[in-house]
Amino acid sequence: YVHYCPNETIQGIAMHEIPKIDKPLMADMTSVILSQPLDVSKFDLIYAGAQKNIGPAGLTIVIISKELMEKGDSSLPKILRYSEHSKANSMLNTPPTFSWYFAGKVFKWIKRSGGLDHFEALNKKKAEKLYDFIDSSDLYENNLQKSQRSLTNVTFNLKNDDLNSSFLDKSKANSLLNLKGHALVGGMRASIYNAMPE
């Protein structure tokens, strides 16, 4: 099988095309699920944590082909077999009920807002606005190729590192929070998931 993550959140790198391969395709869609239309028939397994676009952490969405589900190892405990979860309609054990409830509210909000086509257009608009500003600035930079830039996690650096603390302080004073980049790479990161306003 081939496993990939279409949106890498730390460095803001995205694969915008679904790989065409002759092996089972599996994907971690945590940071992009429900941000755009998706042809799930091109995948054998998709999984996504809820905490980005669906609801609180503690809930995972799994979409799996029947063929792959039937190949599961029957020696595994029931809790580790997707086929058992499917047979039990996702009620093999007590589910995280608040997360389910909250996810239901989010699904209705997405539908009322115009569905996945709406969010795809909105997310592109939000990202383009940020990237255009960064690219035309003498203060900021993003060194990723445009074709590989994430529409969800816009990373950037200040050209003068001495300004990082001041930038974060002024951002916070203007209600722009949590812009500090991941500890592994530094810089800045604006995560613009579905619920983030334009």
Where are these regions (language model features)?
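Conserved PLP-binding catalytic core of the aspartate aminotransferase-like
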Residues: Y140-S171
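Solvent-exposed alpha-helices and their adjacent loops that cap or buttress functional pockets
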Residues: E17-K20, P37-S41, K52-P56, K146-S147, ...
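Active-site C-terminal subdomain of aminotransferase-like
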Residues: A50-Y131, Q145
